UniProtKB/Swiss-Prot annotation:
This is Sesquiterpene synthase 9. One of its GO terms (molecular function) is germacrene C synthase activity. It is found in: Cytoplasm. It comes from Solanum lycopersicum. Belongs to the terpene synthase family. Tpsa subfamily. Its cofactor is Mg(2+); Mn(2+). Coiled coil: none annotated. Mg(2+) 2 binds at D300, D304. Keywords: Cytoplasm, Lyase, Magnesium, Manganese, Metal-binding.
Length: 548
């Protein structure tokens, strides 16, 4: 029989207060006309350089890679698309650099990143008869690094790329400890790659770090570097202005005082969504999605870290009804959050109805209701004498409660590109890439956070459920889930192969969302414990400008 909620203490988590408060209210700097003109002039020079460089040359590969890693490729999407298509089409023909590990690996990675299937057999020439990579390659640090990055584009059953990852990781770890400070640029680049491979790197974080690495590379193109710095700083001002507007909205709600038990993480939510899309054209969508994510965080903490079961019964019911008249049925302290939730989606409807895109909000509401039902399911298990669900049952619910299915759908609501009903239906039906992304988020979050959650009385995580059902140790369970995460990344990679089921920009949102999970939950839950690593990352991309 279920225990009475009146007999239970509220499961307070004692989250630390906001790191930032209302710091970004004052960031209202406008981008000057002089800045815009200067960036546009550089942009046209770089565009000319990109178009005039021969597609089938190493220089073109290096240039495109630098543009992407410096964070300026979004200015040249069409030109890069055409170039990579030409490079892919020509890849079946003999090339002068086909025995150069650096070039072959770079071409492979760029082509696969763009969604073209290039066979991993291109690496066979670098292996012995036993399938192992030749030891002579260990002297080629740039080649090893290029192969290492390429191996992260692998899909399931690509044994040669599994071998490549093992081989390069072993030797790069040895090399980085032995490189002298005279090779500091290369040492930093290798160290960064081992920590966060390009495929798993958030675009803005990657750009911020690579600008410094590229500047210290003697072979850098000074015009491209200057353009990347100017563009980074201009975008930073743009993002600061957005965050200032959002901070004003958050301050007016006064939720830091109304919900002291919840994580006050507006800036961290903005960083999260900035990871999904940073380009200026996504400004409206970014602001909408940040509001939704911030409210979701409050609702999540209400379920996990404050409300009683009886209070949550009516709260869940009100959200499923999605009706302002339901507000009187819930606890007074819950009403501001409920009203804010209705208001956010109502604002979306007002904006999108003018564009004939009202149906998008229907899909977004459905995903939010589904997420809250998953939260409530966990509450029911916990209320049922701390019932530990079967692992398979918990997996299905936990993938939804991770929130990534909701975000994958809702992040598309405010964007201006055309999105068909079929695309939204595809997302909502737990497509392979969305499910893989949600699994990565849930598994990584549970690995770093399950022990803290259990201390305050949280429903059994995937970790506890697996250990109970399969008699596994904690370490064995961690290994199992890290393997699941690796395989999920392979599934994501495969979904990018053309022809894709949905537009590439939709897949890119899910990829970036997965990168956020990898960044936030790599070693600990930096969203919950936001004072260290995450604070530094936010500082580097939203406060500190790049020195020109």
């Amino acid at each position: 029989m279920a225990a009475s909620s009146a007999d239970k203490c509220r499961p307070l988590a004692n989250f630390h207060p906001s790191v930032w408060g209302y710091h970004f209210l004052s960031y209202t700097h406008e981008i000057t006309n002089q800045e815009k003109v200067e960036v546009d002039e550089y942009k046209e020079t770089i565009r000319k350089m990109l178009v005039e460089t021969c597609d089938n040359s190493t220089q073109k590969l290096v240039l495109i890679d630098a543009m992407q890693r410096l964070g300026v490729a979004y200015h040249f999407d069409n030109e890069i698309e055409t170039s990579i298509q030409n490079i892919f089409d020509a890849s079946s023909k003999q090339n002068d650099n086909d025995n150069n590990l650096y070039v072959v690996s770079l071409r492979f990675r760029l082509v696969r990143q763009q969604g073209h299937y290039m066979s991993s057999d291109v690496f066979k020439q670098f292996t012995n008869q036993d399938g192992k990579f030749k030891e002579t390659l260990t002297n080629d640090v740039q080649g090893l690094l290029s192969l290492y990055e390429a191996s992260h584009l692998r899909v399931r059953n690509e044994e040669i790329l599994e071998e490549a990852l093992t081989f390069t990781t072993t030797h790069l770890e040895s090399i980085v400890s032995n490189l002298s400070n005279n090779n500091n640029s290369l040492k930093v680049e290798v160290g960064e790659a081992l920590t966060q491979p390009i495929r798993m790197t958030l675009p803005r974080m990657g750009a911020r770090k690579y600008i410094s690495i590229y500047e210290n590379n003697d072979a850098h193109h000074h015009l491209l570097l200057k353009f990347a710095k100017l563009d980074f700083n201009m975008l930073q001002k743009f993002h600061q202005r957005e965050l200032s507007d959002l901070t004003r909205w958050w301050k007016d709600l006064d939720f830091a005082n109304k919900y002291p038990y919840a994580r006050d993480r507006l800036v961290e939510c903005y960083f999260w969504i900035l990871g999904v899309y940073f380009e200026p054209k996504y400004s409206r969508a970014r602001k909408m999605m940040t509001k939704v994510l911030n409210l979701t965080s409050i609702i999540d903490d209400t379920f996990d870290a404050y409300a009683t079961f009886d209070e949550l019964v009516t709260f869940n019911d009100a959200i499923q009804r999605w009706d302002a008249n339901a507000i009187d049925s819930i606890q007074p302290y819950m009403r501001p959050a409920y009203q804010a939730l209705l208001d956010i989606y109502s604002e979306m409807e007002q904006v999108l109805s003018k564009e004939g895109k009202l149906d998008r909000v229907y899909y977004a509401k459905n995903e939010m209701k589904k997420l809250v039902r998953a939260y409530f399911k966990e509450t029911q298990w916990l209320n049922d004498c701390d019932h530990i669900p079967k692992y398979e049952e918990q997996v299905e619910n936990a993938i939804v409660s991770a929130g990534y299915m909701m975000i994958s759908t809702t992040c598309l609501v405010g964007i201006e590109e055309f999105i068909s009903h079929e695309t939204f239906e595809w997302l909502m039906n737990e497509s392979v890439i969305v499910r893989a992304s949600a699994l990565i988020a849930r598994a990584m979050n549970d690995i770093v956070g399950h022990e803290d959650e259990q201390e305050r009385g949280h429903v059994a995580s995937l970790i506890e459920c697996y250990m109970k059902d399969y008699g596994a140790s904690k370490q064995e369970t961690y290994i199992k889930f890290l393997k699941e995460v690796t395989n999920a990344w392979k599934d994501i990679n495969k979904q990018f192969f053309r022809p894709t089921e949905v537009p590439m920009f939709v897949l890119e949102r899910v990829l970036n969302l997965t990168r956020v999970a990898d960044t936030l939950y790599k070693e600990k839950d930096t969203y919950t414990n936001a004072k260290g690593k995450l604070k530094n990352m936010i500082n580097s991309i939203l406060i500190e400008s790049v020195k020109i």
